[in-house]
Amino acid sequence: MAQAHPRSGTRLFRTYAARGVRGSQRQPGGLAEQWFQPPNLKRAFSSSLSDSNESPAVASDDPDDPDFPGSLVGQRRRRPRGSGSRNQRTLTNTPRVQRLRPRPPQKCSTPCSRLRPPPFPNCSPGCLGSDHSVCIQSRDSNELGTSASLFSSPASPGAPDPLYADSAVPGSFHLPAASLSEPSVPCPQVAATGDRYTGRALRAEASFRSSLFSLVNSGATEENKFGTDGENVKESCCERRQQMGNRLTDPDLTSPGKRKAACKKVVSQGVDQRDYEESSACKDLRVPGEISRPKRTGPLRKRKQQEATGTPPRHYHQSKKKRKASVSLWNLNTSQRDSWTKTRASFGFHKKKIITSVIEVCSSVASSSSRSLLSECSTPPIKNRAHLTVSSRCSSVYLLSPLKTLHVTDQRPSYAEKVYGECNQEGPIPFSDCLSTEKLERCEKIGEGVFGEVFQIINDQAPVALKIIAIEGLDLVNGSHQKTFEEILPEIIISKELSLLSSEAYNRTEGFIGLNSVHCVQGLYPPLLLKAWDHYNTTKRSANDRPDFFQEDQLFIILEFEFGGVDLERMKTKLSSVATAKSILHQITASLAVAEASLHFEHRDLHWGNVLLKKTNLKELRYTLNGKTSTIPTHGLQVNIIDYTLSRLERDGIVVFCDISAEEDLFTGEGDYQFEIYRLMRKENKNCWGEYHPYNNVLWLHYLTDKILNKMKFKTKCQSAAMKQIRKNLQHFHRTVLSFSSATDLLCQHSLFR
């Protein structure tokens, strides 16, 4: 099942840099060149911001400067305002102007005061990083044809806005007090014409500026509300200025009575994009170590561009049904909330795994987000590993950490080569080489998620499950970005590691779903799979897009798992007795305990949709914990644990986890005890998701016990003394489970499992 501002990302992923840095970061060597060397700190800025009585005007020698050629700022002609008379004469001898002309773009000498909004991101050289404060704009940057000061909020008397106090001006400069509390007068001669005209002109400018500021904020309100910490802007500077220019030239905005309605329209358009942008917040924010991928056009913006150019939409998969269903997860009725699959699809919650070393866990989590973090130097393998686990095979976890040896740096395989290596392939193969027509004739779709589709086929006279994931493409899949080779590799290796616990000697369990094979294929979606998809959609109503839009060069990863059975949620009325429920709980606890001992494993999302049950003829199942083998009565059912999207795993000094510290939607859910477990996990690890806290497994065991006691109905009633005693034991387990520290502690110490 399925996440990165970044437009998510997530989905197995990692980065080293901190997120949420305001503005774009300058690279070394990209510093702005000084236009002049200020001889005096008081004269470092243009006279438009300084008091004309304290310092003389500064002349400019640049032909593009608005004060050129060498004339004093005080002699600039006055521009007529809307509230003034059209026939009123100016103080200069320039011809009368019939319309408002655009001002030239600002130059380096124009200060960037605290009253200005933050610079547009991703706009070089007009944007500033956190280490530069002087605003430098390109000559064609101001497409609106008016002063950039119009886009600052109206100055309020009193303290300036503290939000940009540190980045507005350099610390070595001092702004006059008047400039911080009063709007600057564009021309000294205007003030000399009299109080009546000055007041009229200032009121007109303030009114115009206030209207523009409200228009700008109307579009930014929704973005800041649903973005990560309200700090990341999701549009490039050019797109933002183009949108504002369209608003200013809109004839509907010429009438003051229509401005309010226009603002409401802009806000409503932002709400339409909210669900998609939640999963892609901070996508435009580049950080060191981030994957370089082509910028993809969002579905709403892509549709608008196609309408503007007259081209029909090619792949617009965000249907009206899906948009309505994803507006609010928590407004659904109780019956719709019962299925976590539906809720998970609305989240787009397929996050990218973070990969780091054990030593770097805490520092990495503090400085990373749910984006990609890939450790450039892994720690040495844990000494005395045999004391923890005796491995009978070679682990592939080392592939997640790039080699640092100098003489093999240029020979380091790419992530694509690593994935092909795990598939035992040299490159992608056709669908037909992996899935023959004979296999697909009896194909059936059995599940889905944001990641893709799950089908069941018959292979070697046994049912198997195929998890098909599209990778490396530009098309959105179910509203989310496709994974890359780097992002899919950890999922392959984690599934492989947990599957191979069934072949270990020192810590062994068969409780995790078995991975049979992995393939990377290329081509169109097979027609027989589309037929199975259509049947599923007819009978159960799929929440996914029909996978018929892929091109011939599309890549897919096919994970072939053993058939795990039916999830516990759908079996809530089909279990024979409470003794069967006890066996299920025992098997889950044993599997988690073995994974804790071998891999420092936390599942972190073990709801009853991720517990599969299938029939077995075995009377007992064996597991080995720290070299000691024990048995569990099956009562005819075998448990398989699935879905490691949020899981945490550690092997050979490498930690793989999913940082969900910024996923507020996950921690604000209501209507099921499951959502309380997420909040309890965050309380346990203090939102540091790279650390190992096996108590989180205990929390999920408490959740599953609650479901067994309160939500499940058994075919055989608890009438016999033996059944009544088992139920009492389960109730005692439910009351006492939270006092244990781990699944291993529970398995070894609790009376239910003795």
UniProtKB/Swiss-Prot annotation:
Posttranslational modification: Autophosphorylated on both serine and threonine residues. Strongly phosphorylated during mitosis but this does not appear to significantly affect its intrinsic kinase activity. Phosphorylation by AURKB is required for full activity toward histone H3 at 'Ser-3' in mitosis.
Transmembrane segments: none
Record: active site: 127 (proton acceptor), 605 (proton acceptor)
GO cellular component: centrosome; chromosome; cytoplasm; male germ cell nucleus; nucleus; spindle
Composition bias, Polar residues: 45-55
Keyword Nucleus: yes
Tissues expressing this chain: Expressed in germ cells within the testis of adults and of embryos from day 24 onwards. Also present in adult thymus and weakly expressed in spleen, lung and whole embryo.
InterPro entries in the record: GSG2_C, Kinase-like_dom_sf, Prot_kinase_dom, Protein_kinase_ATP_BS
Recorded superkingdom: Eukaryota
Protein keywords: ATP-binding, Cell cycle, Chromatin regulator, Chromosome, Cytoplasm, Cytoskeleton, Kinase, Magnesium, Nucleotide-binding, Nucleus, Phosphoprotein, Serine/threonine-protein kinase, Transferase
One GO BP annotation of this record: mitotic sister chromatid cohesion
Ranges where the Protein kinase domain occurs: 440-754
Residue numbers carrying Phosphothreonine: 379
Ranges annotated as biased composition (Basic and acidic residues): 272-287
Subcellular location: Nucleus; Chromosome; Cytoplasm, Cytoskeleton, Spindle
EC numbers, comma separated: 2.7.11.1
Phosphoserine: residues bearing it: 55
Pfam families from the UniProt entry: Haspin_kinase
Annotated Basic residues bias: 294-304, 314-325
Cofactor: Mg(2+)
PANTHER family the UniProt entry points to: INTERLEUKIN-1 RECEPTOR-ASSOCIATED KINASE (PTHR24419), SERINE_THREONINE-PROTEIN KINASE HASPIN (PTHR24419:SF18)
Function: Serine/threonine-protein kinase that phosphorylates histone H3 at 'Thr-3' (H3T3ph) during mitosis. May act through H3T3ph to both position and modulate activation of AURKB and other components of the chromosomal passenger complex (CPC) at centromeres to ensure proper chromatid cohesion, metaphase alignment and normal progression through the cell cycle.
Family (UniProt): Belongs to the protein kinase superfamily. Ser/Thr protein kinase family. Haspin subfamily.
Protein name in UniProt: Serine/threonine-protein kinase haspin
Organism: Mus musculus
